[in-house]
């Protein structure tokens, strides 16, 4: 891995160990490193936590956002539309995550941002796995978030981001249910 990245072993090893510590990777042995798969229960717990925390962030962002912030969010959505049209899942994933963390920046909640980063590290692989299957559902409610923030409506922004997490999360939920149903095979 270090060779592929054109760097020395130490920073790669440190990064891998950090991801193991954060629960994103598992390392049964020094030569066996894998992406950790969340259980259905873990996914549902993370989704519930995100709904509360990101709801709080969206509500505060609605109160704090400048017109420039709103335009930046709208531009991110335009770029995400282009990524969807181009079937560029990687770019879409990056823009989706950037959108959610831009809300944190607007809300000026750095401690909460750090907590959400930890949750995203754990759920990121599942989001990546389901993003292409989710298609439009992965960003549809972002438009309502932006409109609510533009209108300075914290309650609507909170509901919009929570609905986004539920709607986009349906694909993830189905993946986890399917895994659970085939575990006995």
State what each model feature region is.
Residues 4, 134-185:
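C-terminal regulatory/effector modules of DNA-binding transcriptional regulators
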Residues 30, 53, 75, 137-140:
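Alpha-helix N-cap/N′ positions at the starts of helices
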Residues 62-63, 108, 131-132:
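Short helix-capping/hinge motifs at transmembrane helix termini and TM-loop junctions
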Residues 46, 67-128, 140-148, 156-166:
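Conserved amphipathic alpha-helical segments that form helical-bundle/coiled-coil interaction surfaces
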Residues 1-63, 170-185:
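Short linear motifs at protein or domain termini
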Residues 21-26, 118-121, 135-136:
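Mobile beta-alpha loop/short-helix "lid" or hinge segments that flank ligand
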């Amino acid at each position: 891995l270090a060779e592929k990245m054109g760097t020395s072993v130490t920073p790669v090893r440190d990064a891998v160990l950090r991801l193991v510590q954060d629960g994103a990777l598992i390392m049964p042995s020094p030569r066996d490193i894998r992406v950790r798969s969340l259980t259905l229960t873990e996914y549902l717990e993370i989704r519930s936590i995100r709904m509360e925390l990101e709801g709080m962030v969206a509500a505060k962002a609605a109160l704090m956002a400048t017109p420039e912030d709103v335009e930046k969010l709208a531009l991110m959505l335009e770029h995400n539309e282009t990524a969807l049209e181009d079937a560029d899942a990687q770019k879409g994933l990056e823009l989706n995550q950037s959108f959610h963390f831009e809300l944190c920046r607007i809300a000026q909640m750095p401690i909460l941002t750090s907590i959400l980063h930890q949750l995203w590290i754990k759920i990121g692989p599942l989001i990546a796995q389901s993003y292409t299957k989710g298609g439009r559902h992965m960003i549809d409610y972002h438009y309502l978030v932006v409109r609510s923030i533009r209108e300075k409506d914290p309650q609507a922004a909170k509901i919009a981001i929570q609905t986004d997490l539920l709607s986009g999360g349906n694909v993830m939920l189905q993946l986890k249910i399917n895994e659970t149903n085939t575990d006995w095979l």
